[in-house]
A protein has these predicted regions:
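Feature detects long, helix-prone N-terminal segments enriched in hydrophobes
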Residues: 2-17, 21-24, 61
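Short, structured protein-protein interaction patches enriched in aromatics and acidic/basic residues
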Residues: 41-63
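Ubiquitin system architectures
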Residues: 74-84
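Conserved small/polar residues in nucleotide/adenosyl-binding loops
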Residues: 125-132
Length: 135
């Protein structure tokens, strides 16, 4: 299952997750996960955050806080966040992965909302492979 990660350093990357999701996504967000539904994020997308991020003193995630409208209620989103979709698995509501169209849609939304501040992380493995092909 693919998710879209936004770090507190304003870097964006795709990441592959396995079940149990609370463990694999938990590693990315740094602890217990909480699914939130920001008003500025269209359905069926959701944002997964660290449930105890404020208690742990994690840094503010500006993009997450903007989407969550933290300026209205004063509760910021902190730490790395993972975007996924909600859907149904075997008839039960669950978190499901993103496909390529979802990644393009969310990438465009994130770029627009952040004014271009959030950028795709550079894959050094990809760069090395490209250099090898050029030689």
């Amino acid at each position: 299952m693919k998710g879209l990660v936004i770090t507190t350093d304003d870097l964006m990357r795709t990441e592959e997750y396995t079940t149990p999701l609370h463990e694999s996504i938990g590693k990315t967000v740094g602890g217990w996960i909480k699914v939130v539904h920001p008003k500025l994020l269209p359905a069926p997308y959701c944002m997964i955050v660290n449930e105890e991020g404020l208690l742990l003193g994690l840094p503010v995630n500006l993009l997450g806080s903007i989407l969550y409208e933290s300026f209205r209620h004063g509760n910021p989103i902190v730490g790395n966040i993972v975007f996924c979709k909600e859907g149904f698995v075997e008839g039960e509501r669950d978190i499901i992965g993103l496909d390529d169209d979802d990644l393009k849609c969310l990438g465009a939304l994130i770029s627009a909302v952040s004014g271009g501040a959030v950028k795709w992380a550079v894959s050094y493995t990809h760069l090395r492979a490209h250099e090898t092909l050029m030689n």
